């Protein structure tokens, strides 16, 4: 399952069947698409399989996430997310992947009339009081079928990497929704230890959460829209890591750091949000 690490301007990875999913941008194309040097550097690093940090907004969660392209996940990446961030590891996926795999938002499942009638507790537990948004991005959680418990760094890396690779294979080969869902079930089970967050339809035009931001970075880098990440917390765990400390971490480890405004401004200037 080891991916092939690309150069800064191209992306390719080996699938389970040794086929390649490849997308390439010339340096000039990346420059035109990305614009500001800081954003360009971040996208080039991400396209090369390196991490990027994103602070959403002081008007939203006020959180910084450390992000990696899903198909480049290794046990070392998972360990870094676990040790350096402290928050929940999550897999952000593009809405087109969610549609192909028919992954429902948990909020929709929990408000399904038939299920609520069968399990009335779901009505008591409904999400109607989010302070940062109207709807949660969480869908199902998954484990790869070749994992044991699914929680080890090795297990979670396998789950993350193969989901990213499989998503690329599905999109590249034009599988039907049913074929995609069968392929997903062949390799994965639920529940699992990788929570999946699905992009809102319309992307950043409809929701400006970390899910949409993480997916947009992958798209800009020419990668499959699957990104693994975790929220960065204060050492005592009592709150999000202050943005100043997040920037210091980014500088210390030479990781590009962006804000939600950076990405929204880029998409606004280019007349697109996806």
State each model region's role.
Residues 21-274:
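Catalytic domains of riboflavin
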Residues 1, 11-13, 21, 25:
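Aromatic (phenylalanine/tyrosine) cluster motif
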Residues 7-9:
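Cysteine-centered motifs
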């Amino acid at each position: 399952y080891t991916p092939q690490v690309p150069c800064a301007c191209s992306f390719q990875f080996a699938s389970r069947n040794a086929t390649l999913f490849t997308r390439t941008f010339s340096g000039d194309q990346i420059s035109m698409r990305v614009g500001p040097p800081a954003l360009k550097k971040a996208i080039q690093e991400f396209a090369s399989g390196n991490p990027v940090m994103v602070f959403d907004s002081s008007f939203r969660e006020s959180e910084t996430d450390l992000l990696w392209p899903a198909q480049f996940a290794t046990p070392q990446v998972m360990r870094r997310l676990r040790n350096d961030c402290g928050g929940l590891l999550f897999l952000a996926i593009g809405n087109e992947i969610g549609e192909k795999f028919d992954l429902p938002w948990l909020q929709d499942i929990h408000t399904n009339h038939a299920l609520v009638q069968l399990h009335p507790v779901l009505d008591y537990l409904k999400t109607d009081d989010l302070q940062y948004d109207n709807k949660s991005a969480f869908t199902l959680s998954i484990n790869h079928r070749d994992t044991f418990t699914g929680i080890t760094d090795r297990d979670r890396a396998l789950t993350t990497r193969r989901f990213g690779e499989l998503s690329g294979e599905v999109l590249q080969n034009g599988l039907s929704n049913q074929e995609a869902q069968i392929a997903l079930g062949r390799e994965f089970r639920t529940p699992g230890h990788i929570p999946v967050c699905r992009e809102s339809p319309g992307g950043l035009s409809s929701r400006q959460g970390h899910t949409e931001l993480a997916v947009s970075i992958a798209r800009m880098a020419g990668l499959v829209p699957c990104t693994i990440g975790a929220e960065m917390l204060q050492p005592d765990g009592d709150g999000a890591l202050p943005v100043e400390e997040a920037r210091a971490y980014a500088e210390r480890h030479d990781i590009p750091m962006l804000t939600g405004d950076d990405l929204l401004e880029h998409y606004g200037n280019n007349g697109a949000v996806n």
